[in-house]
Design a protein with these regions (language model features):
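Vicinal oxygen chelate
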Residues: 2-10, 46-69, 71-127, 155-156, 186-204, ...
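Short glycine-/small-residue-rich flexible loop motifs, especially phosphate/cofactor-binding loops
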Residues: 20, 67, 98, 137, ...
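Short, charged/polar, Gly/Pro-enriched secondary-structure boundary elements
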Residues: 43-47, 102, 161-166, 172-173, ...
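Core segments of cupin and vicinal oxygen chelate
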Residues: 6-41, 125-164
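Short, well-ordered alpha-helical segments in soluble proteins
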Residues: 74, 110-111, 123-126, 144
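Ordered, small/hydrophobic-rich secondary-structure cores
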Residues: 5-86
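Short, conserved, surface-exposed binding loops centered on an aromatic residue
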Residues: 113-114, 147-149, 170
C-alpha cells in the first residue's frame, strides 16, 4: 500500500534504537525495513506524534518476542501480548510506546500476510472525522484508494492489499506524519497535507 511511511523523531538515534531493538526481535534487520523511514526533526519537519503503527509477524511467538525485547530494553508497554477479538477472531497483538510516545504494535492474524510489506496497518488519529473524510475522498482516485467501513468514530482507507484507519475516538490527533503512495498509471500528481498535518504524496 505505502511506498514510504516516514516518522520524524525528536531524537533520531533513540528512535532508531527502539525500532531496531523491536524489529530485530521479529527477524527484520534495518536493510529490510522497507517502507518504514525515520528522520530527525528540524527546521523542515516537526516530531511525529499520535501515530499507531503495526508490523506484520509470522507467529504469536514473534509478537511475544517483539514485546519482550522492548520491555527488557526499558521501553513502555502499551498493551501486553494477547488475543484481541474486538478486531478479529484470530488477531494476536502486543503494543509498545516509542520514544515519542507513538504506539508500535506487532500483530499476527492467525495466517501469514501475503507480500513483502513490513507495515500491517496504521491508525491515524484525526481531530475532525468529516474534514478528514473529505480530504481522503478527494485524494482516493489519484492514490488508488477506496474508503469503506465507516463507523461513527472511524473509517478505513484501503487499496487491493492493505488498509489504514482514520480514527476520531478521543485519542490524540496524529501530527507530522509523511505518507507516500505508488501512483496508479496515468494518475495526476498529488502533494497535499491533511487537516492535522500529515503530508501525502504519490510521488514516492
Amino acid at each position: 500500500m505505502f511506498s514510504t511511511v516516514t516518522i520524524t523523531a525528536s531524537d533520531l538515534d533513540a528512535s532508531r534504537r527502539f525500532y531496531r531493538t523491536t524489529l530485530d526481535a521479529i527477524g527484520v534487520m534495518p536493510d529490510a525495513w522497507g517502507e518504514l523511514r525515520l528522520r530527525a526533526a528540524g527546521d523542515r519537519a516537526d516530531v511525529t506524534t499520535g501515530l499507531h503503527i503495526a508490523f506484520v509477524t509470522r507467529s504469536q511467538d514473534q509478537v511475544d518476542a517483539f514485546w519482550r525485547a522492548g520491555v527488557d530494553a526499558g521501553y513502555e508497554s502499551d498493551g501486553d501480548p494477547g488475543r484481541r477479538p474486538i478486531y478479529d477472531d484470530d488477531y494476536y497483538g502486543a503494543f509498545l510506546l516509542d520514544p515519542d510516545h507513538n504506539s508500535a504494535e506487532a500483530v499476527f492474524h492467525g495466517r501469514e500476510r501475503v507480500g513483502p510489506a513490513l507495515i500491517d496497518h496504521l491508525w491515524i488519529g484525526v481531530s475532525d472525522l468529516a474534514a478528514s473524510r473529505r480530504f481522503w475522498e478527494a485524494l482516493a482516485p489519484p492514490l488508488g484508494l477506496t474508503l469503506y467501513g465507516e463507523r461513527p468514530e472511524r473509517f478505513h482507507v484501503r487499496d487491493e492489499n492493505r488498509s489504514f484507519a482514520l480514527v476520531a475516538d478521543g485519542r490524540q490527533a496524529t501530527r507530522n506524519l509523511a505518507l507516500a503512495f505508488p501512483a496508479p498509471a496515468g494518475a495526476e500528481r498529488v502533494d497535499a497535507t491533511d487537516p492535522d498535518g500529515t503530508t501525502v504524496t504519490n510521488a514516492g
